[in-house]
């Protein structure tokens, strides 16, 4: 995690212009659990990080975070949080995609959902088209409403399969 084990780094990142931070990237860190592991939830240090991010004005991004950790961040945060780039698991089951319940929960708590166009996570995988992306937007909007949805591109092109396999591992 960018903050390592230093709560003071949060304010430094804000001073450097950072406005949104991933709480986890696919795997466990000192804050909580990513989407590719058994989810142990938000840690005590994670609660401190959420509080400090709220204080300085950095938004918590839960795109790569596990379900339990996400729920606990949403409940802990005094400010809106986001899934800046995700897709609904109702159209394709994948650890990075979010369930209907997760999408509704974040929207019900004032959060935001950015629908990504990352083809491997769309309904038809790498064979997906713009129509599949439009379907994902409509599906998500029917759950969260038009005020809690946007475009969360996470656009990656020009890379081979090895790069995408690398993306599923811890950074």
Briefly describe each language-model feature range.
Residues 1-126, 134-141, 148, 170:
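Extended, charged catalytic domains and RNA/DNA-binding interfaces, predominantly
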Residues 144-166:
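Short acidic/histidine-rich active-site segments
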């Amino acid at each position: 995690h960018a903050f390592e084990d230093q709560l003071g780094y949060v304010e430094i990142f804000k001073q450097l212009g950072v406005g949104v931070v991933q709480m986890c990237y696919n795997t466990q860190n000192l804050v909580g659990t990513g989407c590719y592991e058994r989810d142990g939830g938000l840690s005590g240090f994670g609660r401190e990080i959420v509080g400090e991010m709220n204080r300085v004005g950095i938004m918590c991004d839960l795109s790569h975070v596990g379900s339990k950790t996400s729920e606990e961040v949403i409940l802990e945060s005094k400010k809106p949080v986001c899934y800046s780039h995700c897709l609904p698991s109702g159209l394709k089951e994948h650890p990075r995609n979010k369930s209907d319940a997760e999408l509704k929960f974040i929207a019900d708590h004032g959060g935001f959902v950015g629908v990504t166009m990352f083809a491997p996570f769309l309904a038809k995988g790498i064979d997906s088209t713009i129509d599949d992306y439009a379907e994902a937007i409509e599906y998500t909007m029917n759950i969260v409403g038009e005020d809690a949805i946007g475009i969360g591109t996470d656009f990656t092109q020009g890379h081979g399969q090895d790069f995408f396999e690398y993306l599923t591992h811890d950074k």
